[in-house]
């Protein structure tokens, strides 16, 4: 039977800091891959920070978060770290 190796990433994010939070996701993903993890699980709202409250009402922030998620997915793929599933 094939086994699947998971890594759980409990990281401290900052509300609204999309670039910094994405960098942490990349860093933890690299560390997990180095430890032979096949799946890395992050807490909800890792990219946007929690709670986003009023930021969620701003169309520009929602678009920026979407764009950053796509950029992060591309970077993960380029680094052969897999895909980003939300």
Task: Outline where the language-model segments fall.
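Hydrophobic structural segments
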Residues: 1-86
């Amino acid at each position: 039977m094939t086994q699947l190796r998971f890594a759980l990433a409990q990281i401290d994010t900052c509300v609204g800091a999309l670039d910094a939070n994405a960098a942490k996701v990349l860093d933890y993903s690299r560390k997990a891959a180095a430890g032979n993890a096949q799946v890395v699980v992050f807490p909800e709202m890792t990219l946007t920070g929690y709670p986003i409250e009023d930021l969620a009402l701003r169309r520009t922030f929602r678009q920026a978060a979407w764009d950053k998620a796509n950029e992060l997915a591309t970077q993960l793929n380029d680094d052969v770290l897999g895909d980003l599933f939300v």
